[in-house]
C-alpha cells in the first residue's frame, strides 16, 4: 500500500508479509516495524488509509491465513485494527476484532456520511467445500469512538462462494 504515514506529505510504502507489517519512510526508505506475528499463521492483507483526516494513515490487518479451514474461527482468519503510538516509528497496538474464517482481503470505505468503515472479504463461506455451502460473508466494520471497544458489523453480501479480491468504486453520480 502507498500512504503518508507521518504527515510529511510524502507517500510512504506499507508492506505485509507472513510475519511482519512494516512501513518504509520516504525518501530514505528506512524500515519501521508496525507489528510482528499477529497470529500463529501468516498475515494475509492490510487496509491502509487516512480515515481521521490528520494526514497520517490508519491500518487494519488480516491474518491467521488458513484457507483450508472454513468453519473454525480460532484456526482460520483474524482481523485487527492497529492503534498507532504517538511516535509512529515505534510498534503499534493490535486490537483483535470479530471475524469470519478465511479472512482474505480488506479495504477502507468512505460512507455517505463521510465516516470510514472497514470492509472485509473472506475467501470462502463458512463450511464451504468445493465452492458449495454457505456464501462468503462480506462484512462492514463500524469504528467505535474508542477502537478498543467492540466494533459493530453490517452484512454487505453473502451470495458468493469463493472470492479473491475486491475494490471500492463510485459507479454512478449520486456521491453515495
Model-identified regions with their sequence ranges:
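Beta-propeller-forming repeat regions
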Residues: 1-176
Amino acid at each position: 500500500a502507498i500512504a503518508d504515514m507521518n504527515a510529511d506529505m510524502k507517500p510512504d510504502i506499507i508492506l505485509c508479509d507472513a510475519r511482519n507489517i512494516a512501513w518504509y519512510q520516504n525518501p530514505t526508505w528506512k524500515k519501521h516495524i508496525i507489528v510482528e506475528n499477529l497470529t500463529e499463521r501468516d498475515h494475509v492483507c492490510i487496509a491502509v488509509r487516512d480515515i481521521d483526516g490528520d494526514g497520517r494513515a490508519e491500518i487494519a490487518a488480516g491474518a491467521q491465513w488458513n484457507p483450508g479451514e472454513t468453519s473454525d474461527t480460532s484456526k482460520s482468519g483474524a482481523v485487527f485494527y492497529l492503534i498507532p503510538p504517538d511516535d509512529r516509528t515505534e510498534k503499534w497496538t493490535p486490537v483483535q476484532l470479530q471475524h469470519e474464517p478465511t479472512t482474505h482481503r480488506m479495504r477502507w470505505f468512505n460512507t455517505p456520511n463521510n465516516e470510514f468503515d472497514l470492509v472485509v472479504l473472506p475467501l470462502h463461506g463458512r463450511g464451504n467445500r468445493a465452492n458449495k455451502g454457505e456464501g462468503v460473508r462480506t462484512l462492514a466494520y463500524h469504528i467505535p469512538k474508542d477502537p478498543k471497544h467492540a466494533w459493530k458489523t453490517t452484512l454487505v453480501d453473502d451470495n458468493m462462494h469463493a472470492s479473491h479480491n475486491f475494490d471500492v468504486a463510485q459507479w454512478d453520480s449520486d456521491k453515495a
